[in-house]
Swiss-Prot record:
Topology relative to the membrane: Multi-pass membrane protein
GO CC terms, sorted: AMPA glutamate receptor complex; dendrite; dendritic spine; endocytic vesicle membrane; extracellular vesicle; neuronal cell body; plasma membrane; postsynaptic density membrane
Entry's family note: Belongs to the glutamate-gated ion channel (TC 1.A.10.1) family. GRIA4 subfamily.
Molecular function terms, GO-annotated: AMPA glutamate receptor activity; amyloid-beta binding; glutamate-gated receptor activity; ligand-gated monoatomic ion channel activity involved in regulation of presynaptic membrane potential; transmitter-gated monoatomic ion channel activity involved in regulation of postsynaptic membrane potential
Organism ancestry: Eukaryota, Metazoa, Chordata, Craniata, Vertebrata
Residues carrying Phosphoserine: S862
Extracellular-side segments: 22-544, 639-813
Main location as per UniProt: membrane
Keyword check for Membrane: yes
Function summary: Ionotropic glutamate receptor that functions as a ligand-gated cation channel, gated by L-glutamate and glutamatergic agonists such as alpha-amino-3-hydroxy-5-methyl-4-isoxazolepropionic acid (AMPA), quisqualic acid, and kainic acid. L-glutamate acts as an excitatory neurotransmitter at many synapses in the central nervous system and plays an important role in fast excitatory synaptic transmission.
Protein name, as recorded: Glutamate receptor 4
UniProt-listed GO biological process terms: glutamate receptor signaling pathway; modulation of chemical synaptic transmission; negative regulation of smooth muscle cell apoptotic process; synaptic transmission, glutamatergic
Name of encoding gene: GRIA4
Amino acid sequence: MRIISRQIVLLFSGFWGLAMGAFPSSVQIGGLFIRNTDQEYTAFRLAIFLHNTSPNASEAPFNLVPHVDNIETANSFAVTNAFCSQYSRGVFAIFGLYDKRSVHTLTSFCSALHISLITPSFPTEGESQFVLQLRPSLRGALLSLLDHYEWNCFVFLYDTDRGYSILQAIMEKAGQNGWHVSAICVENFNDVSYRQLLEELDRRQEKKFVIDCEIERLQNILEQIVSVGKHVKGYHYIIANLGFKDISLERFIHGGANVTGFQLVDFNTPMVIKLMDRWKKLDQREYPGSETPPKYTSALTYDGVLVMAETFRSLRRQKIDISRRGNAGDCLANPAAPWGQGIDMERTLKQVRIQGLTGNVQFDHYGRRVNYTMDVFELKSTGPRKVGYWNDMDKLVLIQDVPTLGNDTAAIENRTVVVTTIMESPYVMYKKNHEMFEGNDKYEGYCVDLASEIAKHIGIKYKIAIVPDGKYGARDADTKIWNGMVGELVYGKAEIAIAPLTITLVREEVIDFSKPFMSLGISIMIKKPQKSKPGVFSFLDPLAYEIWMCIVFAYIGVSVVLFLVSRFSPYEWHTEEPEDGKEGPSDQPPNEFGIFNSLWFSLGAFMQQGCDISPRSLSGRIVGGVWWFFTLIIISSYTANLAAFLTVERMVSPIESAEDLAKQTEIAYGTLDSGSTKEFFRRSKIAVYEKMWTYMRSAEPSVFTRTTAEGVARVRKSKGKFAFLLESTMNEYIEQRKPCDTMKVGGNLDSKGYGVATPKGSSLRTPVNLAVLKLSEAGVLDKLKNKWWYDKGECGPKDSGSKDKTSALSLSNVAGVFYILVGGLGLAMLVALIEFCYKSRAEAKRMKLTFSEAIRNKARLSITGSVGENGRVLTPDCPKAVHTGTAIRQSSGLAVIASDLP
């Protein structure tokens, strides 16, 4: 039965072939592919495969047989060889791609030999009879978009890979409308040249750009725009390309810049959806490029095969015999021998009208696409979104842009947000047993708790991601590329940064910050100095040495004045009873305030001790009164300060401020290599900070550290020869951690704050900001700081980190007092010995004794109080004899003494 059925089919096919003429069952077509067109070649193969395997009930099938040449180097010689190879194989049409180096060679051969070229490459300039342009022109759509935005001053970046058609159209329109267009060819630019150009344009306040480049160069330009931070709000880019969805714009989504472009392929049409299902099933090893969705050039390639297939069907229906093409031919013959049916092929190609992946495929008599529609897309927070369309009839038509704030919020709630942070104690740390946990549970710290609180208020799921390079975020001065957490946000790798990230102007230009969740400033960390040992005479410290000198001079001065007034005042002179054997009063009335007694009186008053003598005269008592008042105040002040000085241990710090650091060279100082502290010194215009920056920048070895932990370790190991400049909050935290050997000195150098960062234009900005404000007003932020700074501190209570600490007195505190006591006692013994010897010598002369005998008699008397050898009582020499007598009566200037001596 199967044999009979097969014979019937063959018989039917034979009759159909006779009816349709001698049309071949296998149609030879050519394929020319240049470098970096793997995906286009995959689309070419897939289209041919689907055509050859798809049943057609209405017409007899025919197979497309491709002859493909891949040209690695698209020069004239390689293109000529490939084209001649195709021509010699008897192809009826060639599908091929070209660039600016091969376009003229291909079009010349096609015109000379009447071989039609179907191409998805850029449209050629001028008229090419045998070239069918699958790619629509962007001129009309781009000019309509510029009119809509009312741009009259912008930058046009282009290369010559696609010719000058768009440049010519824009410059003509600029001349008509008075536009100011800066046209710049970027064909020979490298990464550095792009960045320099963008920086220069930014200095000129250029914010609007039209970019007309092929996909590879376009992607490179966009990467450089991101690297210099020009993808933020305020910038607008129009991409003169038909594959808006083919471009990687993830980083621009978070940046906030407005990006507009055109999309030729509508991925929502049934035909495209069906092809995509088949595309995803392709083996990536056999079909390179199938791992990504087809680009618009691949869609044009697919449509090109459909156009060729439809052309051959039309030729067969018209009973045009193309079989006389032959299997050989000399493409270099002189004169050229064109293909006879080439005109019919070219005419039929231009008459084709089909629905392909790129919409309506139709050509004019010049072989250019007509009656096509392209969509206009803009980049939104959720990705590319259609905002309108353009066609020849309606021109630019914009559709209503429905607000999608709610949709954006819902999209955030339905996915996991990446939170970038940095390993920095006490903000983010690994738990002790973190190996037992997964995800966010591995971490603990201030920022971990803060992220949890913010997520609760916003209602999102999040994933903590540690920044790979371990940096906060700074822009390289040469490459203009951001690193650290700022780079993670700028380049779209994270959506929130919750870390000790300082709010600065340069960062605010590329990312958004919430209200500060912590206030701080730059501070100085040094190694805690050893406690100073009190000096022997530390009891003198309560008063300055100048005051002590003044007290000594005051003491001497008061004693001299007291001596003088006592001498001149008659009331200080009084009469004494006469000595033995004398009658009447003494010729020299006594005065108690000699110079030595005056000194003794002043010293006793100063020491707040009593004295056997006191002034009798009014003038002397005035001197004594003011001296007592003086000593009262001085002694009270001294006593008040003495308690504090003797019971407080002091640590002498070699550095107390930034000025101290700047004016010395013995102690080195530095900051983090990448962060706001370094940026503060680099940009500062204050003389002290400029001097510090000059030193830090030129210091060898480098004083910049990669991490805070490295800086702290350097402080601890430097034996007081290195100071680390860091945020005050981190300084205070480390001061509370063992081994408790660092300390903060001086005040903060500036005032700033830490904020939660989001990419520019992110829908998370407002919810995050409100969450931080709520946490601040509820006191949660203060509780978190106390928890991680002081409650978990290892160096005692919060106030124990002060520089002075009260303690019990030690012997060293009062050693000087004991020294003075011992010294005074020793001095007294020495003076007593001198007096003993002096009086013994005088006694020896008076008693006609030898000095040794006088010494022995004095010693015997001093020890035993015994009588000497001659029966004389040896008594210590006294200035006056003591007598017992009646009361003294003085009358008329005479003294009468009654004595009871026999």
